[in-house]
């Protein structure tokens, strides 16, 4: 995908996140799995991010494909994530998927919850 096409996407899926998903799918030996990111009520800031692996894409889901793997977002969650980026980090504090969300007005210290 070109940078221009990437910029037109409502949510970005970084190379680091796609590479990690690809590695996890190889470990699981299930190429049908997709990384699903979603938003639910809760957390210390009002909303929280969730990540899970899912084999299916539901009607209305938005998908982004990179490096042969897919990121899936349901329509309700997408409205809170437009302009955001799903990334992956690994460091001294551990490894995790996370969302860089320009719509978040506040976030908690761990970055797992936010408010708009």
Swiss-Prot record:
Cofactor descriptive note: Binds 1 iron-sulfur cluster per subunit.
UniProt cofactor(s): iron-sulfur cluster
Biological role stated in the UniProt entry: Required for insertion of 4Fe-4S clusters for at least IspG.
Pfam families, A to Z: Fe-S_biosyn
NCBIfam families referenced in this protein's UniProt entry, alphabetically: iron-sulfur cluster assembly accessory protein, PRK13623.1
Source superkingdom: Bacteria
Residues that hold iron-sulfur cluster according to the record: 44, 108, 110
GO molecular function: 2 iron, 2 sulfur cluster binding; 4 iron, 4 sulfur cluster binding; iron ion binding
Name listed for the protein in its UniProt record: Iron-sulfur cluster insertion protein ErpA
Organism: Shewanella sp. (strain ANA-3)
């Amino acid at each position: 995908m070109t940078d221009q096409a990437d910029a037109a996407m409502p949510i970005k899926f970084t190379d680091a996140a796609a590479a990690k998903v690809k590695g996890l799918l190889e470990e699981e030996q299930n190429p049908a799995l997709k990384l699903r990111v979603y938003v639910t009520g809760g957390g210390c800031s009002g909303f929280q991010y969730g990540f899970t692996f899912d084999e299916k894409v539901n009607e209305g889901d938005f998908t982004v494909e990179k490096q042969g793997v897919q990121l899936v977002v349901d329509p309700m969650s997408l409205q809170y994530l437009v302009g955001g980026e799903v990334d992956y980090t690994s460091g001294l504090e551990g490894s995790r998927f996370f969302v860089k969300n320009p719509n978040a007005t506040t976030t908690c210290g761990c970055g797992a919850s936010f408010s708009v």
